[in-house]
């Protein structure tokens, strides 16, 4: 949804995930309902046109300075991200589509756009624990790793890191 909605012509305009996060701040139940509806509409419209999967939801925490993530993130608080992403994923499932949490282990803290640069997150694993909460608490069908280097774990980007993939499988217990 929002600025990164790829299918636009003859599709419902969906709000950015940050719009749902702002609604969460004042009206959590309404935000959960809206997130569920967004997931359902997104999946139903794509499936009606032969697209069977969308790489959503974004699980990055909104730390503020990352413009590439920006309004693609639901919220700064992991509890809000878990609730809203869970509701969106439920809507996807209701319309017959799986969910893919991204960008593991978290892209929201770094400023550079990983589509054009190679961001490095220099936080410790301990400092990243909030970013990992959505991956620990949600039941996801798939996870997309980030094209970001996390010095605390590896010199490779998470997408090419056996250490991060092992952490996802063994510590977080992801089995999708």
Predicted region positions:
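Enzymes and membrane/adaptor proteins characterized by extended Gly/Ser/Thr/Asp/Glu-rich
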Residues: 1-81, 109-121, 146-156
């Amino acid at each position: 949804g929002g600025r990164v909605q790829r299918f636009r012509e003859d599709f419902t305009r969906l709000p950015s995930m940050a719009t749902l996060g702002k609604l969460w701040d004042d009206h959590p139940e309404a935000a959960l309902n809206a997130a569920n509806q967004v997931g359902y509409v997104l999946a139903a419209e794509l499936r009606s046109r032969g697209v069977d999967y969308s790489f959503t939801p974004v699980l990055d925490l909104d730390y503020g300075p990352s413009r590439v993530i920006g309004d693609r993130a639901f919220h700064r608080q992991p509890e809000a991200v878990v609730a809203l992403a869970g509701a969106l994923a439920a809507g996807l499932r209701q319309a017959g589509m799986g969910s893919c949490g991204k960008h593991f282990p978290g892209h929201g803290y770094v400023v550079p756009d990983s589509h054009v640069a190679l961001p490095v997150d220099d936080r410790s694993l301990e400092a990243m624990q909030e970013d990992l909460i959505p991956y620990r608490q949600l039941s996801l069908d798939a996870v997309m790793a980030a094209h970001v280097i996390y010095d605390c774990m590896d010199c490779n980007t998470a997408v090419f890191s056996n250490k991060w993939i092992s952490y996802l499988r063994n510590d977080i217990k992801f089995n999708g």
